[in-house]
Regions:
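Hydrophobic/aromatic beta-strand patches that form the interior of the parallel beta-sheet core
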Residues: 3, 32, 103-105, 133-135
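Catalytic beta-strand/loop cores that center a nucleophilic Ser/Cys/Thr
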Residues: 53, 58-129
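Solvent-exposed loop/turn segments at secondary-structure junctions
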Residues: 7-12, 31, 37-41, 73, ...
Length: 163
């Protein structure tokens, strides 16, 4: 299990380390990306394939409503159907929903920011035999103190580890 939480920029992984990470996940290892884990490794296209998207912008930092789109998944079963929270909201360079084998778990209720459009915030996919989960939330410390967020992340760790 590998977790990249709130990383950004071009990190100092050499080609051997990058290949080892992808091989680990392809062989059945788990990967979780949290918040700015999509704002890194822009020059490594396989990483974008792994996470499902690259960060484009964060136009909203405010109180928002988040909708649970898949309440049956082990990482969202404990969540109410709608969450109200304050965070920095990411928008991505590509359409996450268009990716094969990808299921959106959480999405922004666009009406809560006076916008139109589709804004996925958390999803899961596979990479080879590995399970991958990404959640764009988690910019502010206050969210990490919320029991629902910690429960969701703990369930994500268990799920990506295959438990």
């Amino acid at each position: 299990m590998v977790v990249f939480a709130s990383i950004s920029g071009e990190l100092p992984l050499d080609e051997t380390q990058k290949a080892a990470l992808l091989s680990f996940i392809e062989a059945g290892g788990g990967f979780i990306g949290i918040h700015s884990a999509t704002d890194t490794f822009y020059s490594w296209p396989e990483y974008g394939e792994l996470t499902g998207a690259y960060f484009r912008e964060h136009p909203w930092t405010q109180e928002v409503r988040v909708t649970v789109e898949d309440a049956t998944h082990p990482t969202t079963q404990m969540l109410p159907s709608t969450l109200t929270l304050t965070d920095e909201i990411y928008v991505f360079r590509s359409d996450v929903r268009a990716r094969p084998n990808t299921q959106v778990l959480l999405a922004l209720d666009a009406s809560s920011v006076g916008a139109a459009g589709d804004f996925p915030l958390a999803w899961f996919t596979t990479y080879g035999a590995g399970r991958v989960l990404y959640n764009a939330l988690g910019h502010f410390d206050a969210l990490w103190r919320e029991p629902f967020f910690r429960a969701h992340l703990l369930a994500a760790i268990r799920w990506t580890a295959g438990r």
